[in-house]
Structure formats: C-alpha cells, structure tokens
C-alpha cells in the first residue's frame, strides 16, 4: 500500500510538535501559580487541541483525495451510449471519469487557453483533420502503448515521433459516401469520387462547405491519391457541378437529394444511417428515395475518416489516461464506442453489429483506402489554398 502523501506527513510532524507544546505550557507556568496564568494556559491548550483536531481531519481528507483515481476527459462526442461506456471503465478499473463536453474547436481553444494549468487528461475528437491540427499545435502527449499499437491499424493513428511515441489513435471509422436520387441517377455515374468533377454531373451536386473538416479530410485524401495538380482540377470540376452554393450539414444534403433540389450529395455514412434507423415517417420517405455508393471500389477504396483519442499534453494522470484509451480500444468497448454514432470499430478483428451499416453495405465487406490518415492532415494547408483558388466556399 502506498504511504501518505508528503503534505500528510508534514501535518503529522507539525502535530507532534504542537502536542509537545501542550505538555510544556503547564510546566512553564508552575512557578507562578496565579489564576490569570492558569486561565491563559487553559485557553491556549484548548485552542491548540482544537487546531490539532482540525488539522488531523485535513490530513485524513488530503490522503483520501490523493489516493482517489480519476481521469479528466474533454470530449467532442455527445452520445447516449457513452455514459454506459465510461461507467464500464470505472467498474473495471476503479478510475472515475470526469467529463467535459464541447465541440472540437471549443476543446482545442480551451486547451490552448489553459496551457500547462489544464486539468485535461484525455481528448476525444471526431475528425482526422482536427486530430492532426491538435498534434501540430502541441496539444497532445505522444505515448507508447503496446495494447493500442496492437489493436489500432498503423494507418489509423499518428505517425510515430522520434522516440516512438504516438500522439493520437483512431477509435472508430466512418465512410465519406456518395448519396444519389435513385429515380434520376445511374449508379455507374457516381461510383468514384472523380466523377463528382465530371461534366456529366453538371448542376447535380449538393455538398456542405468545402472548408468543413469532413470535406477537408476527403479532399486531403484525394490529393494524396491524385497529386496536387489533378486534385485542384478535380475540385474546380466539383464547383462547376454544384446545384446550389454549399450550405447546411450532411443531413441537409441527403434531404435535398430526396426533395429533388439536387441529384447527388456527399455525406458521412453515419448521417445516412441515422435516417435509415429513424422511425419518423419523413425520414422513412427520405430513405426510400435515395441510394448510397461506397466510391472507388475498383481503385484505392472509399475514404475513411476517424474519431480518435489522445493524451493531453499536460495530463496530471497520464497512467490513467493511457488505461482509458486502451479500454476504448478493447473489443467490448469498441462496439459501444462505434455504435454510439453509427460508425465502424477501428480495432482489428472487431466486427460491427450495427444493422443500418449492414443494410448500407448489403452485408458485404467494402474496400476502404489504406493511406495513413495522418497524411490527410498533412495536406490541409495546400487543400485550403486550392479551395480559395477554385472558389469552393
């Protein structure tokens, strides 16, 4: 069992000295046995004994607080299943999870503002571009964990630092898919990302802002596959094929396809899965009118983005933080983590149990790209410059 913390031992030494003082006071007063001195001695002894009692309680409380095991989590995930996931970690380890919820941008701004005073131990973000930015800004602490390295494929985690430490790990994956109007579009005309920039699809495409991290990640992947020159020409073609200026989120694009505002849209797979799992009549109507393509099955495969985790740069509970990430990569936790947002598990050998995802893929495996997700982030500055040049808002 670990011994008491230094502050508790300091209290004990002070208490011993105070107790000795209590015994000395009467001896000093004996030569002068006036009532005044006796009353003063009595009051002083009572004060010291009262202080000793209070100090003893503080020492005990300090020891208890020092021994409490916690991990402080800043999370951009806000799903109903997460509470059960974190409770499972506490039950398995005895480590309490203190959680702060915010969006990715808010979390990163808070970490920068807090600096070394930040209480954060673990950071969960929901996009590869944001994880890369957090690493580049020095917000994460590279770690070495055999359990995480064995569980998470190399292409779904940060590149190793010089000492072999890894700044972040993917914990779930989502596909950037193409949705189309079944009544108006032939699947063969949208089965690759490249065809989004083909003149045959002029005036048909809906998409959210090009500068949104989900699109930046896709465009970074296309740049990795095609090279900068071809990627920029492709982006120019996509802009020429827009049915309307970019606006809204991914769900808005799917609904626009069903409503006939456009014929083709780009979305993360989980937005479509939510609609497919919904019991609302309006969502069932949308789902009946659209179909989905997992692009580039005959070439490099569908672009996969991630939600991932990292240990905070100034974590005060580093061992607990690593344990928490290792837990999230375990087979049991992986399905909880992934199903919370209709995603696929990132860990090797863990099979999704999500019915909407199985329906989306026809129950068959699909080819996903294998480029390092860290390479996507490395292209972000160049991609943003391309978007500015081609007028992709």
Task: Specify the residue positions occupied by each region the protein language model found.
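Early extracytoplasmic/lumenal segment of secretory-pathway proteins
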Residues: 67-133, 393
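Extracellular/periplasmic bilobal clamshell ligand-binding domains
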Residues: 353-393
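Mature extracytoplasmic/periplasmic domains
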Residues: 307-370
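Periplasmic solute-binding protein
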Residues: 131-139, 161-191, 219-220, 304-310
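A structural signal for short loop-to-beta-strand junctions that line the ligand-binding cleft
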Residues: 118-123, 141-178, 194, 205-207
């Amino acid at each position: 069992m670990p011994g008491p913390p230094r502050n508790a031992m300091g209290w004990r030494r002070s208490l011993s000295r105070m107790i000795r003082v209590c015994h000395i006071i009467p001896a000093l007063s004996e030569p002068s046995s006036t009532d005044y001195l006796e009353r003063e001695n009595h009051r002083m002894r009572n004060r010291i004994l009262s202080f000793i009692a209070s100090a003893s309680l503080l020492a005990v409380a300090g020891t208890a607080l020092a021994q409490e095991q916690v991990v402080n989590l800043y999370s951009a995930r806000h799903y109903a299943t997460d509470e059960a996931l974190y409770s499972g970690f506490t039950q398995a380890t005895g480590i309490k999870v203190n959680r702060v919820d915010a969006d990715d941008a808010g979390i990163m701004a808070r970490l920068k503002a807090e600096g070394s005073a930040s209480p954060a131990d673990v950071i969960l973000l929901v996009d590869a571009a944001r994880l890369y930015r957090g690493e580049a800004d020095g917000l994460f602490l590279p770690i070495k964990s055999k359990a995480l390295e064995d569980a998470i494929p190399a292409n779904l985690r940060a590149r190793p630092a010089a000492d072999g430490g890894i700044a972040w790990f993917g914990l779930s994956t989502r596909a950037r898919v193409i949705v189309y109007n079944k009544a108006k579009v032939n699947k063969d005309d949208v089965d690759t990302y490249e065809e989004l920039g083909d003149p045959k699809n002029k005036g048909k495409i809906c998409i959210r802002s090009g500068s949104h991290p989900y699109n930046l990640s896709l465009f970074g992947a296309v740049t990795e596959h095609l090279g900068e020159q071809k990627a920029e020409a492709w982006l120019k073609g996509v802009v020429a094929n827009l049915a309307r200026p970019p606006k809204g989120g991914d769900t808005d694009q799917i609904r626009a396809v069903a409503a006939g505002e456009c014929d083709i849209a780009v979305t993360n797979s989980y937005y479509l899965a939510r609609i497919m799992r919904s019991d609302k009549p309006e969502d069932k109507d949308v789902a009946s009118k659209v179909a989905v393509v997992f692009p580039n099955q005959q070439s490099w495969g569908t672009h996969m983005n991630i939600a991932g985790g990292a240990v905070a740069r100034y974590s005060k509970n580093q061992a607990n933080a690593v344990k928490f990430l290792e837990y999230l990569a375990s087979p049991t936790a992986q399905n909880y983590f992934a199903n919370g947002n209709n995603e696929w598990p990132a860990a090797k050998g863990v099979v999704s149990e999500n019915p909407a995802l199985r329906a989306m893929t026809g129950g068959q495996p699909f080819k996903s790209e294998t480029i390092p997700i860290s390479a996507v982030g490395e292209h972000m500055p160049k991609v943003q410059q391309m978007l500015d040049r081609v007028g992709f808002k």
